[in-house]
A protein has these predicted regions:
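Short Gly/Ser/Thr- and charged-rich N-terminal loops/segments
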Residues: 11-14
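Short terminal hydrophobic/aromatic SLiMs and anchors at protein ends
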Residues: 16-18
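Basic, nucleic-acid-interacting segments
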Residues: 20, 24-261
Length: 261
């Protein structure tokens, strides 16, 4: 990914052997790719409080924070109605079943950008399940991708890491993003090439922008991809060991990371 060629020092004969082996591997094995797409919903306020949603690339740090999204004891969350409505719109556009009952749960883990020590997310009862979309790669191949689920959750804060010599580096945290509404769209592992993954991600972005629920501006981090990549023998229905590639914020990164893996 960095552009460094780890095989440059090998003699031509060994390179030819490696290239032959790669071709044989491609004939015998296929890639299996599933994706998780995190999309910030376009609401005026956060998921569980009245704090405004601000552009974290320009806003003064830690100015859109309250006891709820700051994780102070005793603060009670109240769900954002518009975020729920937007999540339902996306579910319908993805041919999902909209569940009559949905619930939130605490996803417990420790990280400095998570002030409560848990993330409010949906686990057992997501708002939308069992959908699908059809996409087309550049070579005209149609690919039907299943949508396992789409669920709502809150975004984390944003960390800024500063390196310094002598171990004097430090990290600053901006909580303006903490609590911003997110919709996580989880696909089935139905893609078998980086081209198919690109077509799927592009289609999801188009749908979100058409519905007006997300700007699609990946430079601002409002749309982030995670690719789950494995390989298996061609014809096998058993999934291989999965590698999860997180926080891909561009189509180019998605394609290069998937191809590399």
């Amino acid at each position: 990914l960095s552009g460094h060629d780890p095989l440059a020092h090998l003699p031509a004969g060994e390179l030819a052997t490696i290239a032959w082996g790669i071709r044989m591997t491609n004939d015998r094995y296929e890639a299996v790719i599933g994706m998780e797409i995190h999309a910030e919903l376009r609401t005026a306020s956060k998921m569980f409080c009245a704090c405004p949603v601000v552009d974290t690339t320009v806003a003064e740090p830690n100015t859109a924070v309250c006891p709820v999204c700051g994780g102070l004891p005793g603060a009670m969350p109240v769900v954002n109605k518009l975020a729920v409505e937007q999540a339902m719109m996306v579910g319908l556009a993805l041919n999902c079943q909209i569940n009559a009952f949905t619930s939130f749960a605490r996803k417990n883990y420790f990280y400095p950008d998570l002030p409560k020590g848990y993330q409010i997310s949906q686990y057992d009862d997501p708002i939308a399940t069992n959908g699908w979309i059809e996409v087309q790669t550049d070579d005209g191949e149609p690919v039907r991708v299943g949508i396992r689920r789409a669920h709502m959750e809150e975004d984390t804060a944003k960390s800024f890491h500063h390196a310094a010599p002598g171990g004097r580096g430090y990290t600053l945290i901006d909580f303006n993003r903490s609590g911003v509404p997110l919709l996580e769209i989880v696909s089935e592992p139905d893609m078998h090439s980086a081209a198919a993954a690109l077509a799927y991600a592009t289609k999801i972005r188009e749908i979100l922008r058409y519905l007006g629920v997300n700007s699609g501006d990946m430079e601002r981090g409002v749309l982030r991809f995670e690719a789950n990549v494995s390989v298996r023998p061609r014809g096998s229905q058993t999934l291989g060991t999965r590698t999860e590639i997180k926080n891909l914020n561009s189509f180019r990164a998605l394609v290069r990371a998937s191809e590399y893996e």
